[in-house]
Amino acid sequence: MHYVGLAEMAAAVSNAGGLGIITGLTQGTPEKLANEIARCKEMTGKPFGVNLTFLPSLTPPDYPGLVNTIIQSGVKVVETAGNNPAKWMPQLKEAGIKVIHKCTSVRHSVKAQDIGCDAVSVDGFECGGHPGEDDIPNFILLPRAADELEIPFVASGGMADARSLVASLAMGAEGMNMGTRFIATKEAPVHDNVKQLSLIHISEPTR
């Protein structure tokens, strides 16, 4: 949800009873992230989290600064993605922050559990942006995750409505994670033409 998961989106989701997520790398710097977190707090008194995607790069973002900003801002949930977040776990856990790691396979989910993550977001091949290396759809992936994991997990990828939630719960998840579906909302800073296309081509948006 890069460039879409801003304060408006996160606050709306939290106010509706979900857990809204600000995309940390969208902000780019610790100072801008601190400002976005402050804006979100003005729009909701409910809990919300921040996503940090750890990517290999010759010129990486200021990850230490971003992590410190999250801690100093009092955010209590971080969704990590990309590289193994083990390096950051002691600092986050010491601050009392719950860590949800985004995984595209059962083996990565088990690894996240082993390093102390509180929960995982299990992303099937249906997800937008980063379906992983194995191309496993949720109908196969979620039941296997339920068999292997002791920590809670939410289902991600192709989730859009109440039917998605019922299916996720039936396959062992504790809930579901929606992303692409929210691009069509008024809170998304996306051109209306793109929103309309996502509604017309309702089965293809995550391709």
Q: Which role fits each region the language model picked out?
A:
Residues 106-115, 148, 154, 159-176:
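Catalytic cores of alpha/beta
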Residues 3, 19-28, 122-132, 161, ...:
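Glycine-rich phosphate-binding active-site loops on the catalytic face of alpha/beta enzymes
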Residues 11, 139-143, 147, 166-167, ...:
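Residues on a specific face of well-ordered alpha-helices
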Residues 1-149:
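Active-site entrance/lid segments in N-terminal catalytic domains of soluble metabolic enzymes
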Residues 33-37, 185-199:
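C-terminal helical cap(s) of enzyme catalytic domains, especially alpha/beta-barrels
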Residues 151-152, 205:
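Short, proline-centered helix/strand-breaking motifs
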Residues 198-206:
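Residue-level detector of conserved catalytic or cofactor/ligand-binding positions
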